[in-house]
Each structure stands twice: as structure tokens, then as C-alpha cells.
């Protein structure tokens, strides 16, 4: 068939009255459509044809083995069967669930769909765009005018209003530039940045207008119990409640069978944050929907806001207050640094080039991410002790110990440099508040196994998920201030170690703080970390998780290790209120608020002590020079309130 990009047999089902039925179909991806046929002849009308322009999200789920979900927008013009039309509203979102035969097929379909869908693959910046543009809001059409097409698409699906524009139009522009660059870097073809002279004029309030927003039923779509599993980095993430499917057996190694009934009962884990359980959310009141919506934001694992992990390399900026742009030479450097053979050779300075399967028994699958799967495992044999890479780590290893293993298919990773970066940093970072890297193995230059200490307490997010709610719908934290102070103090100790080595973590949040059964607190996930040098004492790369980002990153200014201090302050708010500021906003609106509002405020400041508020104030200074360093934070009275590890163990029982 002409224009076919990928085709093959799959099983699928759609949400609706007969959503329990899985049907075998021949799936064809071309330049414009995703078509489902009854046979591989494809000589008849497809059973279902989905325009690629309507696909808003694709994410892996565990509804079935080797399964992923496609979220698509629908309208009145779409051909929907009468029996299902009752369940769908105009401009709503619908899900299609697709199961493939093998893991490789699944990754192949995900890659192909991401590459062809315009709403997923990012939009490159306009080039040679130098004329003066009059940007504003037209009350007649209820939309923004005079903006580039890529920005118009973003604004149409965001909650940014004409009031936001009037209040701070420059912050809106900054949010748009950041969002587009953040999502579009991997598809940039060395284009120059948008070079626009914007005429920013205040807008008159229209008597009547309509802003195109996402509907509440789209955003508030999944229950808290399904919010599990972020494994974008090579570090392990633990899921204390779910036990997902095991990896299929292969010829030379047999994995332990794992019961999957619980997964089938509880449903999806890696779900699209805008799709799941629409029929359930329609039954919820506004208060309950608001609760669900706020937690869709926290684990935005496969959303359009974070489709790829960006490289840690960044151009230096001479002027701290000037806007930093991507330059061709920086992108060329990034491209050259991602040479697969060179990266694998560097990995082998840390990783052992042998098959590790005889050394471990994989007990159960603990998580699944874009880069690979995490398994809870048991060490059954020690590798050869004369290997210098094994001896270098100085970690005590014993047969029978439990470890976490991240398996990564290197051939399927678009940015191997990020994995190498994380591997090298972990190998060189031995400190009691940083998760221990034990060893790593490379199998035939194709697969990387990273062996880490097992933190059975899970991540801090698991504890925060155990919150109780008052009648007003507000969060009440399961942690008291003494426990919060202990977690923050231990995190500060880990950050002090990193900052002394001129390393910025750049992604501090509750998901990346792990605990063990003894109440010890450790930092994980070094995929975004970067090293400061004399040549580059400031960085400008747009990385991290947006809701925890410092304003200087959103404003695309140079930054240093104090971005970790800001994120630490946001994490403390997260512990107090159960979520970071603006989590109930769509990503673009959240970026605008970070750029516009400055230091976020507690919803109920009277609920915490003066010491806590003083600590937060020191962390959340917009002026970087006024923001405290980690070394300074360790002297604050708030941290003297810290409890003992034993007193934190009580909260670990919540999950």
C-alpha cells in the first residue's frame, strides 16, 4: 500500500458499551491515518480509521501484556456507531487500547506513532521570522491572534486567558517559548530560534468570549490508586501496591512467575492523564474531580509535556539576565556526543561486559518506563571478584541480598548519552543520602543492566499518596513537621555532597526521594544532573519536571546549583499540602504562573510553624542571589526540628 509506514496484526478494543471485547485486527499506519482492517489484504474499508491529527497522547499501560493506549479527540463529524454515540460528547476524548504480540512490536508501534503524530512529535520553531507581529486576543473569535501556528495550537488547548495576557504578556511569551523548546528539541533541524519583534498591547475586556479549554472530564480522569510508576531514568522506582506482569521468559533464562490477577483487577498503571475512566469521572462531583485532576499532573509519565529527556549539555551564558537561545554549534555538539559506539565504550569503563543472568533471580517486575523495566531481584551468585569494575564500587555484596535491576535496551534508546551520564555520576557518587549503585553489566552491546540497592520503603510520593482529606477537599499531610524536617535535612545532606562536586541534580521532587524500611532517606534519578565547570559556571538547559522548576529555568536564564534549592522548597510545599503549586493547572498555564507569580504561597500558612515558613522563604526567593545555598539551609532552625529515622518508620506503614 502506498504511504504505509508500519503494519501488522494486533488486538484492540475501544472504550464504550462493548469495551470488554478484544478484537484481532490488521493495523496500518500511513502518513495521515491509523487504520484497522479485518484482514491483511486491506482491500476493503477499514473498521476504524483514526486521523493522526486527532491523536493527543500515547502511553504504555498494563491493562494487558504488551499493551498501550491511544487517546484521541473526537467531534460530531466522526462516524460513531449509534449504540456508542450516547456515551460520547462533542469534543470529548476517547481511548483505543492496542495489544501487540511482543515487546519489540510494542516499542516499534510506539516509536512509529510518536514520529508521525503532529501533536506528539513536537513542532520545530519557525525560521527567518523577523517581521513585526501584533499579538493579542480577539473577542469576536474568542482566541489569540497574531501568534505563530505552533503557539496558537498550544493556546487553544491551554487555560491561559486574555486576563493572563493583560496581566503579564511577557510571561505568556516566556511560557510559550519554554514549552515549545522543551518539547521540540529532539525534532529541531538546527533551525534558528524564533526572531520576533512582538508588539505587546493590553487587551480590552470583551463583553463575551469563549476560551477553548480542555474539558474537566478530560483532565480529571483517573483515581489516585492508579498513579504509579515513573521509570524514565535508569534508577529504580518502586510500587508498593501493584505487582505488574513479569517479563516473558526467554530461552537462556527463566524468570519467576508472577501473579497478574491484581493488575487485571486494578487496571492500568501507565495511563494517559487525559483519558482514563471518563465514565467514572462523569459520576463524580466537582470536588472529587478537582482532587483527581491534581494528581494526574504529578505522574505525567507519557504526556506531551515530557516526551523526551533532554540532554544535560548546555550552552554557557555570559549574561545571567539575558535570554538564552539554542545555537547550531550546541546542537551539533549534542549530536556528536551521542555516537553509540563511543558511548558504549565509555559505559564499559563502569559496566562489566558479561552476561549477568546467572548472578540474579528476578522476583517481580516493579515498574516499566520508556527506557526499560525495573525488577526486584535476588542475588544468587557473585561475579568474578578480580574484575576491577566490580571492585571499584567498594560496596558490600552478599549472596541472597535483594537488589533492584533496571534493564535497558540500548538499541532502543534515542539518547544514550543521558544514560551514560547518569551511570558515570552514580558510579562516582558514594554518600549515605544517595541511592547506592552496586554494579552494571552490558550484554552484547545491546542491553544494559544497572544494579542498585533496593529501597523497600518506596518513594516519598507513596507516603504523600496516603493523605487523608477533610470535608473541604483539602489535603492533610500524613507527615508531621518533625518528619518533614528530617526528610528535608537528609535531602540537603545529599545535595550538599553533589554541589560540592559541582553537580546539579535538576529534578528534586518527591518521586526522586526514596526511603527504606529503616527510615533512611536517599536521592535517586540522576538522568538530568549536570556538572558545573569553570567554563560553564551557569547552565541554561531546559530540563527537570516543570511544576518543581525554578523561575530562572522557565525564563531561560543562566542558572546554577540553587535551582535544586528552589525544587527542595517546592517539595516541602508538596509534603505540607500533598502536591506542588499549580499541579491542578494545565502545563502551559503552570509555566506562566511560575514565570509570573514569583514565590508560591501556602494555602494555609497558619498550619505550619514559623521555622518552616522561614525555611520556605529562604528556598523560594525568585532572586537567585537572595536564595540560600544548601550549606546555608543546613543551619536553619527548621532542620533542628528533625525527628529520628525510627520516628519516620511509622509513616512508612501508611502504604
Curated annotation (Swiss-Prot):
Physiological role: May be involved in cellular signaling or cytoskeletal functions. May play a role in morphogenetic control.
Pfam families, per database record: PBD (PF00786), PH (PF00169), Pkinase (PF00069)
Catalyses which reaction(s): L-seryl-[protein] + ATP = O-phospho-L-seryl-[protein] + ADP + H(+); L-threonyl-[protein] + ATP = O-phospho-L-threonyl-[protein] + ADP + H(+)
E.C. no: 2.7.11.1
Similarity comment: Belongs to the protein kinase superfamily. STE Ser/Thr protein kinase family. STE20 subfamily.
Protein name: Serine/threonine-protein kinase SKM1
More details: Present with 238 molecules/cell in log phase SD medium.
